[in-house]
Amino acid sequence: MSSSLSPTLQTVNGMDQDEPLPLFPSHYPTALGVDRGTVCIPSPYADNGHAEMSFCGPSAPENPAIAPPLSPSLFWSSHNPHAMPALPLHCPPALPYSEPHIHTAWVDTKPHTSGRHSSFLSRPKLFGKRPEDGDGDEALDDDDPSSSSSGAVVKRDMHFCVVCHDYASGYHYGVWSCEGCKAFFKRSIQGHNDYICPATNQCTIDKNRRKSCQACRLRKCYEMGMMKCGARRERCGYRASRRTAPMRDGSARPVGVRGQSQRLPHTPLHVSLSIPVSRASAESGFSGLSPEQLVYCILEAEPPQIYLKQQMKKPYTESTVMMSLTQLADKELVLMISWAKKIPGFVELSLAHQVQLLECCWLEVLMLGLMWRSIDHPGKLIFSLDLKLNRDEGNCVEGIMEIFDMLLAGSSRFRELKLQKEEYVCLKALILLNSSMYMTSSACEKDLESRTKLLRLLDAVTDALVWAISRTGLSTQQQSARLAHLLMLLSHIRHLSNKGMEHLSSMKRKNVVLLYDLLLEMLDANMAQSRHVSTSVCTDPVTPATSPNTPLPPQLHSPVAHHVTQVNESQCSQE
């Protein structure tokens, strides 16, 4: 080939410029010596080997269509621009596969492989495990960059790791994750996980920096919903949960093959827990729930937002402010009873205990909710979405400034601790269940059984709070310290509630504000319980020994008991 090419080039270069080349390949000089099916093109590189490039198609017809001429500089450099005329090139009908740029100069001819960066259009699927194969027990090293992209996904089902945004290899520990993050989380939950962030616990975790901070990586694993029992549970119900589970927003932003964004399964906890939660709560109450399932139930029990639905005129007066606050409190009390009934295990307590717990804790629950709503608004108290007061605006109410300052201080402390919603709902449930401790004086068998259930429920909610704290990714020592800080705030809220009761009672005595039935009953019951301890009386109206004509204890005639009974009847009718 090389020996025959040199005289060919000499013949072409030796032609006189006055004799133009013919336009058609069939009229080229015979010195070229090339058949119609091949084109001999010298290589521009320094090597001496030359090869023929064959078109994937039949030979050119007798009267071929002339394609636009290509510059000779695409094939070899010319010392004289007039020394070589334009060389027409006949294009073949179709290539076996489509390239994005066909007429580029010297397209790379290396074979297409199904490597990591090759196009998904050139391969039907990647190689690896199916998502429903679970987490497996292989000891994989997350330091291997290829291990994180070896997931088995069809083009339309491609997913990304919710932790580092690399290609997901499957559904591991309750979320879509790559092999590296799966192996890291497995090692963390099985062995040493006392990681400490060298910075501020806000390190960026992505595909390139996922190994820079183990503490922040583990924290993000928990934030995105990875859990120890998630993989085994999801292994059986993967297809069903994938069809029916709603999606949530997360910090990750995965994109599909065509660039379409995919929403991640959002949640502080995975949504697939909803089906086992409903079955367990119907069959065995809270005793059949794991801590994460209990947290999910308490989250679902959260009441909706409230509105005052009226505009307060400025300047504010003592009567207008107190009237607005009591109206909001009365609305929240109605929702609070429904909220308490949705906490797993609460309806298993006796009616007397349910009423007693609500009467003891209602203002603490309201104040905790007020602090939570105000956590992102420094210097303001968000009583409702349409009633926001700062410290100066509350100065018109006599004796309320100390309460305002304590509320702002509590909200500021929650903001410093970066309180999570899972922790907040657990604290609120603890306030409800731990509000009254004098029920030990009751000797009735029903009440003793109810109190035993209450203590078990209190332990379960405490375990749920510990689990919620463990999701923050802190070390064991830091988790213990955080638990202590959160529980110490409950005593602050109890002290604040007592001051609020005294202030509301003074407003009632001065006739500054008109209290509604439910709020008035709650206030009177709380003040009565703070003055003395009730005598030991069997107060369960369901006791068989109780005659239908036997008068009920006074607390069971209250509006609270009426609302609790109404909720019980409505739930029974729905079932």
UniProtKB/Swiss-Prot annotation:
Gene3D superfamilies: Erythroid Transcription Factor GATA-1, subunit A, Retinoid X Receptor. The keyword Zinc applies. Its main location: nucleus. Ovary and testis. Residues 134-145 have a biased composition (Acidic residues). Residues 1-160 are annotated as: Modulating. Residues 108-151, 537-557 are annotated as: Disordered. Pfam families: ERbeta_N, Hormone_recep, zf-C4. Residues 290-526 form the NR LBD domain. A zinc finger (NR C4-type) spans 161-181, 197-221. GO terms for biological process: cellular response to estradiol stimulus; estrogen receptor signaling pathway; gonad development; response to xenobiotic stimulus. The keyword Glycosyltransferase does not apply. Residues 161-226 bind DNA. Binds DNA as a homodimer. Can form a heterodimer with ER-alpha. This is Estrogen receptor beta. It comes from Ictalurus punctatus. The gene is esr2.
